[in-house]
Structures are given as C-alpha cells and as structure tokens.
C-alpha cells in the first residue's frame, strides 16, 4: 500500500542532470503536442536510493525551472525541493514497483491516446509499432480519480507486460530505461492510437495476430545500431 507523506526541504546540487532533463522534456510535451496546459508529469528514478526526481504540481512547463523539480521517496515524502510534487507521484511510484527495470515515467494527456481511453479501448495491434511497448496491445486501466492511491493501484494491476498504459477517461503513461525511451514510447503510442482511431472511423481495422506481434517484439530487440565495445 502506497502512503501519502510530505516533508519539504531545500535544493542541493544532487540530481542536476535529471532536473535539467525533466525541464527539457517537459517543454517537449507541449511542443510535440503530447499534453496541454499543466497536465501530465515526468519522473526519473534512482534505484539505489529509491528516489523519484519528479516534475512539480501545477507549474506550466515553459515556466518550470530546474529548482522547481522535486525529489521524493516512493512513499511521496519530499527529500529535496520546495515545491509540491506532481499530484500523480503515487502513479509514478506504482510504475517503478511494477516495472523494476524502469528508470523513467512519462504521463500525458495526448489527444488520441485519451480518445481511446475515453472509449475504454486498448491500443490494439492495428499498426505493428504497438510492439514497441513490449506487448501485443496496450491495455486500458479502469477509471479512478486523478492523483489518488486508487488510480496508482489500478494502473499497477493493469499494466501487465506492456511498458505503456491507457488510463480510462484520463490519459496515458509510458515507462522506459531512461527518459528519452519513455518519451519516445509515449510519442509512438500516440501515433498508434491515432492510426487506430482513424481506421475505426473508416471501418473495422484489421488487428495483427498475437504470433505476428511476438515476432515483431523480438525483431525490435535487435533494431537500430549496435554499440561496439
């Protein structure tokens, strides 16, 4: 059970790199149309100290400074920072508990992912890029009030093998080995959600079978350039 605790402290030089990354990617959430206003949130996880470096609550992304980024424990207790952390800190904590390899979480209210979430439809394998989430489809968690432990627990129960998740009548989230990976997955799933929605408007989309998706998932593991040494 995730508990809600707060303690506010000042900023040190700890996690300067992570703070900068969160500020930079927060701006990209807006410029790449993955969210609007102050909705959505971003975090990076330190697995050794079990700490989350997370965006603050209610500050526009282009107004957010590195000093606004908050460091909290998985219990929501603030370790460093003067700002209130994102209202969805428990959602992020639940993802790090569900996905031990995850080092970043991006939560958005991107248009087409949110449309499917309002239909309570998963992102199906209408386009093979869904396999980037590591599963044949991206599930949709049941609706729970935003910023609650109940939402966090529902998301944790629903995500399964996927690295992305729709939140009914709310939005989506993506996890990754680093912030760039989580952000890229969120962007990719928005593409897949748009393709699916547009196909649904035109007719009945053909969904790729699970065996083909498993093949694509395996091929994705070797996709891209191989690092030497």
PLM segments and residue spans:
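N-terminal amphipathic/basic-hydrophobic helices that include classical n-h-c signal peptides
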Residues: 1-13
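Glycine-rich flexible loops
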Residues: 10-229
């Amino acid at each position: 059970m995730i508990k809600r605790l707060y303690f506010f402290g000042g900023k040190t030089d700890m996690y300067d790199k992570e703070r900068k990354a969160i500020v930079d990617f927060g701006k990209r959430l807006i410029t790449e149309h993955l969210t609007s206003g102050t909705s959505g949130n971003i975090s990076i996880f330190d697995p050794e100290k079990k700490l989350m470096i997370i965006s603050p609550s209610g500050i526009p992304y282009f107004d957010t400074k590195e000093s606004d980024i908050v460091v909290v424990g998985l219990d929501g207790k603030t370790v460093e920072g003067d700002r209130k952390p994102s209202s969805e800190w428990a959602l992020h904590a639940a993802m790090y508990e569900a996905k031990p390899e995850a080092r970043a979480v991006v939560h958005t209210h991107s248009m087409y992912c949110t449309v499917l979430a309002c239909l309570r439809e998963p992102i199906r394998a209408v386009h093979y890029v869904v396999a980037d989430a590591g599963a044949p489809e991206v599930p949709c968690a049941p609706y729970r009030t935003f910023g609650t432990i109940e939402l966090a627990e529902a998301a944790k129960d629903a995500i399964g093998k996927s690295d992305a998740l729709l939140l009914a009548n709310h939005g989506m989230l993506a996890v990754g080995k680093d912030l760039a990976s989580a952000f890229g997955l969120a962007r990719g799933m928005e593409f897949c959600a748009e393709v699916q929605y547009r196909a649904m408007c035109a007719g009945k989309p053909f969904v790729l079978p699970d065996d083909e998706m498993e093949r694509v998932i395996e091929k994705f593991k070797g996709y891209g350039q191989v690092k030497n040494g």
